[in-house]
Amino acid sequence: MTYPSFTSGEVLTAADMNAVGLWLVKTQTVGTAVSSVTVTGAFSSTYDNYLITLEGGTVSADGDINLKLGASATGYYGFLNYGDVASATPLGATRNNTAQFNWVGGGAAGQRAHVHVQVFGPNKAAYTKLLNGTYQSGSNYGTIQGEHRVATAYTDFTLATGTGTLTGGTIRVYGYKNGLS
């Protein structure tokens, strides 16, 4: 399979553009020493599924980064499979009807913050699925899967620290193309 490659000034055809599967929908810069960042206008009916990333910037303390859809503060369920680099024992943790998706990212004190999570159907009036959140808190690493069991369509989300603050970095929201049309 060949992948599209574009040059400055080139006329792009529908065939060229239809080959692109992931579209950058929104970017937002994180401020200085903030405990949360709300990203508005991130989800729409144009895309069913999304990838959310946060790269760069730093966290002030070991801890996770959490995600909330719109203003919904209930109905979040999930399971975290994780481990500590000093132990070979796998660990698990659950969330049952909590106020947010925990563990979608994180970092170690003074180091880079990160989020990388897939969100399925946030703009549909149905349950929203969350897959492959990349958790870190100090030397603990893991992956979360979850579901938001509130049948509401959302356009916005908030990323928040579990402890400490975020400084700098960029949140990017990508929409997965719905088909070849």
Can you say where each PLM-predicted feature lies in the sequence?
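Surface-exposed molecular-recognition determinants
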Residues: 2-181
